[in-house]
From Swiss-Prot:
InterPro entries: AH/BAR_dom_sf, BAR_APPL2, BAR_dom, DP13A/B, PH-like_dom_sf, PH_domain, PH_DP13A/B, PTB/PI_dom. The gene is Appl2. Residues 1-428 are annotated as: Required for RAB5A binding. GO terms for biological process: adiponectin-activated signaling pathway; cell population proliferation; cellular response to hepatocyte growth factor stimulus; cold acclimation; diet induced thermogenesis; glucose homeostasis; negative regulation of cellular response to insulin stimulus; negative regulation of cytokine production involved in inflammatory response. This is DCC-interacting protein 13-beta. GO terms for cellular component: cytoplasm; cytoplasmic vesicle; early endosome membrane; early phagosome; early phagosome membrane; endosome membrane; macropinosome; membrane. Residues 486-635 form the PID domain. It comes from Mus musculus (Mouse).
Amino acid sequence: MPAVDKLLLEEALQDSPQARSLLSVFEEDAGTLTDYTNQLLQAMQRVYGAQNEMCLATQQLSRQLLAYEKQNFALGKGDEEVISTLHYFSKVMDELNGLHTELAKQLADTMVLPVIQFREKDLTEVSTLKDLFGLASSEHDLSMAKYSRLPKKKENEKAKTEIVKEVAAARRKQHLSSLQYYCALNALQYRKRAAMMEPLIGFAHGQINFFKRGAEMFSKSMDGFLSSVKDMVQSIQVELEAEADKMRVSQQELLSVSESVYTPDIDVATAQINRNLIQKTGYLNLRNKTGLVTTTWERLYFFTQGGNLMCQPRGAVAGGLIQDLDNCSVMAVDCEDRRYCFQISTPSGKPGIILQAESRKEYEEWICAVNNISRQIYLTDNPEAVAIKLNQTALQAVTPITSFGKKQESSCSSQNIKNSDIEDDNIVPKATASIPETEELIAPGTPIQFDIVLPATEFLDQNRGGRRTNPFGETEDGSFPEAEDSLLQQMFIVRFLGSMAVKTDSTAEVIYEAMRQVLAARAIHNIFRMTESHLMVTSQTLRLIDPQTQVSRACFELTSVTQFAAHQENKRLVGFVIRVPESTGEESLSTYIFESNSEGEKICYAINLGKEIIEVQKDPEALARLMLSVPLTNDGKYVLLNDQADDTGGSPSENRGAESEA
C-alpha cells in the first residue's frame, strides 16, 4: 500500500509557519473527509431504508395474495387455479421476506454501523482535538504577550518568575495538544481508507449471502412450478387473443347494420311489427304526477313476467311490480302533446299508468303484447296461436282517443267516469288471494289510494249539477259547528295508510283484509310517506284535521260508519268502512286504514260510544244513564281515559283549544 502523508511530531514544539501551513492542509483534508462521510452515510442509510421497505413490501404483498380468496367477486368462476397459485406465491413471498429481513439486518450491522462509528469516533475526535489545539495556542500567545511586556528597568523578580512559569505551562500545554492533534491527523489518513472499504465489504457479503440462499430456495421444484404457471398464463393469453378476434368480428358485424337500428321511426312503412307477442321488454317513459297539474316523465326499463308488468330502474338489482296485467285493458291516448302514448287500465275500467314508447313499432308492439297478456293467453298450451286470433283486437286498441270524454263514452261503468281524473295517484296491487272468501270481501285488482288529499274531487260534479260533497277536500270555513254541540269530543293522532273500495260491510274481516292489502302494497312499492292528521270523534262525525292549519281534510257522518275494527296483532292499526251514496242511486263501500299513536281499540271505543249516543238521544232516560256511566269534562263532554292528553302530546287545555279552532 502506498505511503501516506504525515505530520512530523518534532516540529510540533517549534510551531513554525511551515508546520502550521502543512497542518492546514491536513485540516482541509479532514474537513473534506467529514463532508464526504456524511454524504456516504446518507447513501448507505438510503440503501438500508430501501431494503427495510422491501421487507415491509414483500410482507404486505404476501398478505394481499392471500386476500384474493376472501374477495367477494361477482364473477368468480374458474378462480380455483388462481387461488392455489397465489397461495403458493404467498408462501414464497414469506420465505423471501425472511431473506430480505436478514439482509437488512446485515446491512445495518456491517455497512451502516461502521460508517457511523467512524464519523462519531474518529472524525469527532479530530474535531475536538482541533478545538483544544486552538485554545492552547491562544493561551500560549497571551502568555508570550505578557512576557514580552516585562520592563527592562526596575525588574520585579516575583512578577517575572510568575510570567515565566505561565509561559512554560502554556507552551507545555500547546506542545501536548499539538502532539495529540498531529497524531490524530496522521492516524486519520490510515483510518479513512479502512473506513471506506469496511462498509462495502459488509454490503457485498450481505448481498452474496442473500443471493446464495435465494438460489437454494428457488430449487428445481420451484423452476417446475414457475414453468407450469408460465404455461397456464400463455394458454390464457391464447384464449384471450382468440376471444378478442371473435369480439372484433362480432363488433364489425354489429356495426354494419343499417341506420334504422339507431334512429327511431326512420322508415315507418317498412317496420315489421310483431303482433303475436306474449312477452315484451324495453325502455318506456312513465308519466308521474308531481302536483295538482304538474307531471314528470321518467325513462325506465320495463318487462313483462307472466301476467305482471315489471319495472327495473337503471342500476337496480331486480325489478319491481308496476301493475297486474290480467284482465286489464290497454289503449292509445293523447297525452301532453307527446307521441306514442298508451294507457293501461284496471280490470274495472279505471285508468292506470300512462307510458310512452320511443317509436311507432315499439308503441304498437307494446299495445299488442299487453293486450295479449291481459287475456291470460300466456297460460294456454299454445299462446302464440291464441295471440294471432287476438290481433284484430290489438289493432283496434292502437287507434288513439282524442279526449277523456270519448274514453268515458266507451266505458260501461259509472265508476270509471267518477275516478278518471284521479287514478294517476293509484297503484293497483296484484290480487294474490285466491280463496273465495277474500274475493267476496274485496274485488281482485281493486285500486288503493295512498294519499288522503284528492284534489281532483274539488271540482263541481257535473252529473248532479251542484257542488259535490268532497270526502277528502278541505272545508271552505275553518269552524265545525257540530263539534260545539256534540256531547262527545275525542282527539287522536293518526297517520293515513290507504283506502280502497270493498264489496261488503257485514263483517270486520273486510277491514283486516284491507289492512293486509294496503300494507302489502306499501311494501311492494316502497311507499313510506304517510299523512299525519288529528282524528276528532264526535257524536255526529269523524273528522280528519290538519295539525298545522287546523283545516278539515275529511269529514264522515258517524251514521255512515258501518264497520270499524282494530288489528288483532298490531294494536295501533285501525280501520273503518264508510257507506257513501252515489249519483246513480246506489251506495258504495270504502274502507280507510290508519296507524294511531294510541291503541286502535280506544278509537273503536270512541266511535262505538258516539254511535250509542246517536241511538240513545231519542230516549232521554237512556241518554241520562249513559252520561252517568262515562266521566264528563267541565263543559259536559265525554272524556275517554285521558286519551286526549296522551295522544296529542299536549295539555288538555291546549287540545280543547285546538278543537275550538277547528
